[in-house]
């Protein structure tokens, strides 16, 4: 597992006067079908702090609070536990003007692709919370690896379980105080109402593009991140009734429907 320090790219931009597109080439080459303009539009949407004269000090301030070697050691330890893939991780400072991420996600955001991970966080994020973000995303990469899933094949239920399991692992490895803020959203009664009225009927949908509004919420009157929180509650409900806790690797390989126990039992898988 390699962590790419984007601060070095920005230094080359300022010192060698290289274009941002050239210095960011190690990432841009991962998806050559995307133009540099498309790439940077996507990165800025996800929270990237822009690279310009006005943000130069912010880039330096962010980098002072990042220990790349320590983060790499941590993720390599997780790779050993998860028997996960050799993934490349690209880390970036978060734009403090990105209110949705600062407020809704506590100043950190991550996206996992099959062979690489993007991670963004605010300059003041403590190291243990940086680890929590990287653990969450690397857990996704490991589950996709073990389950043989991709963007087109992954079901709504699998996506929900992935989110719940990743946060369960964060609590196990780093403590509950470092879990994502959305794990504390919404009570059980509300979640079960959404599950019974809506979600259980769509768990077999495949391809992330087909169920985006269900997973992320915020549309069609669905509260934000309802799919995420349901996934966590399904995982928590299932594992809290286990007499002997299953190890991390066993859980990574476990089929999503086997987590549907207690009030989350459904007939969808038996029709």
Sequence positions of predicted segments:
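N-terminal low-structure segments adjacent to metalloprotease catalytic domains
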Residues: 1-62
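Auxiliary, metal-adjacent structural segments of Zn-dependent hydrolase domains
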Residues: 51-113, 127
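Short pre-active-site segment immediately N-terminal to the catalytic Zn-binding motif
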Residues: 118-133
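Hydrophobic (often cysteine-bearing) scaffold residues that line and stabilize catalytic clefts
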Residues: 131, 158, 162, 227
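Active-site recognition of the HExxH zinc-binding catalytic motif
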Residues: 132-146, 167
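Inter-helical turn/loop segments and adjacent helix faces that build the functional surface
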Residues: 145-156, 175-182, 241-247
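Post-HExxH zinc-binding segment in Zn-dependent metallohydrolases
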Residues: 154-194, 265-267
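Pan-zinc metallopeptidase signature
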Residues: 201-271
């Amino acid at each position: 597992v390699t962590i790419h320090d984007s601060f070095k790219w920005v230094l080359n931009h300022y010192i060698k006067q290289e274009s941002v597109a050239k210095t960011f080439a190690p990432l841009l080459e991962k998806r050559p079908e995307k133009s540099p303009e498309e790439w940077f539009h996507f990165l800025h949407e996800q929270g990237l702090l822009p690279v310009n004269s006005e943000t130069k000090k912010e880039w330096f301030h962010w980098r002072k609070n990042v220990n790349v070697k320590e983060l790499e050691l941590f993720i390599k330890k997780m790779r050993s536990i998860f028997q996960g893939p050799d993934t490349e991780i690209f880390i970036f400072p978060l734009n403090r003007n990105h209110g949705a991420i600062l407020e809704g996600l506590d100043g950190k955001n991550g996206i996992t692709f099959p062979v690489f991970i993007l991670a963004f966080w605010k300059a003041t994020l403590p190291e243990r919370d940086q680890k929590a973000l990287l653990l969450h995303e690397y857990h996704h990469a490991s589950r996709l690896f073990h389950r043989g899933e991709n963007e087109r094949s992954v079901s709504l239920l699998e996506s929900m379980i992935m989110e719940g399991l990743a946060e369960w692992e964060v609590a196990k490895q780093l403590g509950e105080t470092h879990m994502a803020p959305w794990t504390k959203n919404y009570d059980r009664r509300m979640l079960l109402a959404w599950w019974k009225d809506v979600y259980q009927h769509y768990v077999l949908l495949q391809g992330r593009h087909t169920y985006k509004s269900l997973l992320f919420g915020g549309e069609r009157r669905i509260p934000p991140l309802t799919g995420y929180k349901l996934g966590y509650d399904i995982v928590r409900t299932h594992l809290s009734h286990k007499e002997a806790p299953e190890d991390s690797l066993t859980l990574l390989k476990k089929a999503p429907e086997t987590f549907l126990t207690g009030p989350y039992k459904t007939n969808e898988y038996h029709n």
